[in-house]
């Protein structure tokens, strides 16, 4: 094609490899080599000895050996958890400006196999021949010293914490799980649908939603306007009203006198202007500081969207509209809950993966959820093992074994009623829970973890929950006491996935909305899916941060999302 863009030859060369793998691979969009491409080789990079490369990264630690010998830098560029040992001859550069933790360096050097017995565990190191660029650090002020900081402390330096080994590993694990999510659903012919962040629907019916409004801006502008241009007085309104009457009388008199058409037309035009002026003056005279009100309530017709709007708590309802046309779909994006909760399991902003499957029932839903979770576990074991080893070493020694267990073990499946019976039996034998156990409760985290970690010792799917603790859109079972809902429970975190077969029967779902005290009007569009060509379908939601907690073994959800939002905190 005449307009085809041909990549430059240097760019093509940068991504080529010799058949024997002896040529180092350069980054495609940067004139450097990713440290991962050196250290992740089966030989640890030893086969690249003699190659000249350019690397860039941040100094994790440095040793200034004095003017007569090499200084050593441990450099990391974020592409992998391992650091590359870099040797700098003091004759090339003032190494005192290089050794501080956090210093950014770009250097050219020759890869060399370190002498045996040198003390390094790496198979390769870089002997610098030229220092290209340096981003210096004042070690006395740098917030991330060599000493290990707690994850809680790192939350106070969100803009820098990704430079630490732990948070950078979490970032790579998070990236891998996101990649795995898209890969799984794309491989199974699901379409990725972008659902809205701003919505007028409350999927959960909980009411704990962030409101999206411009009324505060409107109010601030109004208050300033009333200061700059004081509203008309009652006398101003009365004067404008009298002018309207006067202009009206003139028109009436001209018509009675059978005046010329031109005179009447001119008088009517003046009357129209008088009426418009009166309406404007009368409207401004009614303006008051504060939010606009109508019948004692906030008048949302003055808001940006002409009605109340919120940040979404779930993309499920919206993505269902596409499932009812395109069959298999999923959405993956941020959701928001205005819960004033400070626990280690709650965020105000978090990510959800929500697939919907048409022509499918609850069993299909459970099968898909199990396959998806296993796929993600295998993905981490195959593509992110070094990062998982770091998490196992520093935080949870059992995290890799847990991934292997979930990836290789068939999930158990029991009804909610059976789960309650098992918990009641445990209580009868002396097991103590903080939360009571009885039919009709929403299982607490301690119940879920006891089922998975103690009784079954593997992932568990609990299904057919009481309708009173589940959402209106879940399909009512024939017993009319339970709904076709399911939760996937895993060790470490408890509930990982919540899903259901959706209620496709118009009369039943309308009654459920009414029973839960929700207004019908906001859900009329959702009911249309049942009015016109209704279809059996199901879906589920996976809390993405919970999946990362499960994988990494970390205890606080604030440490597995780049920029955590929770009550009192919305930094950056």
From Swiss-Prot:
Question: What Gene3D superfamilies does the annotation carry?
Answer: Bira Bifunctional Protein, Domain 2, Nucleic acid-binding proteins, S15/NS1, RNA-binding
- Tell me where it resides: Cytoplasm, Cytosol
Which chemical reaction does it catalyze? tRNA(Asn) + L-asparagine + ATP = L-asparaginyl-tRNA(Asn) + AMP + diphosphate + H(+)
First-level EC class: ligase
One Gene Ontology molecular-function label: ATP binding
Checking InterPro entries in the record gives:
Aa-tRNA-synt_II, aa-tRNA-synth_II, aa-tRNA-synth_II/BPL/LPL, Asn-tRNA-ligase, Asp/Asn-tRNA-synth_IIb, NA-bd_OB-fold, NA-bd_OB_tRNA, WHEP-TRS_dom
**Residue numbers of N-acetylalanine PTMs:** 2
Q: Disruption effect? A: Embryo defective. Developmental arrest of the embryo at the cotyledon stage.
Instruction: Tell me which SUPFAM superfamilies the record gives.
Output: Class II aaRS and biotin synthetases, Nucleic acid-binding proteins
Alphabetized UniProt keyword annotations: Acetylation, Aminoacyl-tRNA synthetase, ATP-binding, Cytoplasm, DNA-binding, Ligase, Nucleotide-binding, Protein biosynthesis
Checking CDD domains in the record gives: AsxRS_core, EcAsnRS_like_N
NCBIfam families tied to this protein:
asnS (TIGR00457), PRK03932.1 (NF003037)
Task: Name the family the entry cites.
Answer: Belongs to the class-II aminoacyl-tRNA synthetase family.
Which PANTHER family does the entry mention? ASPARAGINE--TRNA LIGASE, CYTOPLASMIC 1-RELATED, ASPARTYL/LYSYL-TRNA SYNTHETASE
Name of the featured protein: Asparagine--tRNA ligase, cytoplasmic 1
Origin organism of this chain?
Arabidopsis thaliana
